[in-house]
Amino acid sequence: MFKNKYLQYTFSIVLALMLLAPGFSSAQKWSRAAPFPEASEEVYGIAAGGKLYVLGGLGPGWTAKGLVYEYDPATDQWIKKKNMPLLSHHLAVTQLNGKIYVMGGFVKPEKGPTAWQPIDNAWEYDPANDTWKALAPLPSKRGSPSATVVNGKIYVIGGGGNFPGSKDTSIHPARAHRALGTNEVYDPATNTWETKAPMPTARNHAAIGAVNNKIYVIGGRVGNAFISRGSNTDIVEVYDPAIDQWGPLLAQMPTPRSAVAWGVNRGKIYVVGGEVRTNVMAGTYRAVESYDPAANRWSSLPSMEFPRHGSAGDFIGNKLYVVSGNVQSGGGPATHIETDVNEVLDLDAK
């Protein structure tokens, strides 16, 4: 269950400090599926063709894993696929017409101290043939953005990167850098990019979802790309691609958090897990909350069994899968307590 056995005791201490989620019994709707073969944090989930694909992964020393796994709910089995061509982390991942798109991220600098170097790489993965294809690069280099699809185009929003004119090519917790409101759209039909109206609240590590051709960006991290005291936000903003405008602020997320898993189902956006750091604690969440854009209202759902951040999540049918992740907040003394847990929330369960 935990791949760093030396740190299991540390986890028990951390667990005692975790923020409590609403008082539901997770046994009511959550269940377990086949564990993830290579427990990792900073993995991203996307459903395509009735299967769940988990990509990415980050190990000790900020080493990107470039994992690609396919999960089949019909057989409850995982199959390893070809690794990502470029070993990067903190990606934006989405799917369109059965193809999976990976945008931006961070890599290790080739020289100098270990850090996060923002990239502009874009890739298309074809699950049917297990092949990768390089696409036109993003107009701007950034990591930890979020991506979704509206009307056949891919919107990549937010992220973290350097200040204009900075001599740094990478970012680090000890060096000044910034969150981004950048909004760029990719057209797969022409393999071209276009820059759109920036998001009013610059942020990264946010959840995103498209409902009725509008894009909702939820929570995330402001100020910089690394978890820090007060960096989480509860802000929810909506973008209308048809008129290239951002609307007024919407109902705030009840639990301000970043590095969550998420998925969209039946016109609602579900946000799961995440991490936090305050003056008195650092930890991860079990909380599960859903946002209904039609009513501009939040609801709480049964909590996960395991608190974690950097998990992969998405819906297959009416079941939300939340896979792997790190049970500790990043940046602390024991930052890689990874779990292979694959939890499933069945919205139709009674």
Task: Tell where the protein language model's regions lie, with residue ranges.
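Bacterial N-terminal signal peptides
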Residues: T10-P22
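N-terminal secretory signal peptides that target proteins for export/translocation
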Residues: M1-L7
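Kelch-like beta-propeller repeat domains
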Residues: L15, S26-K350
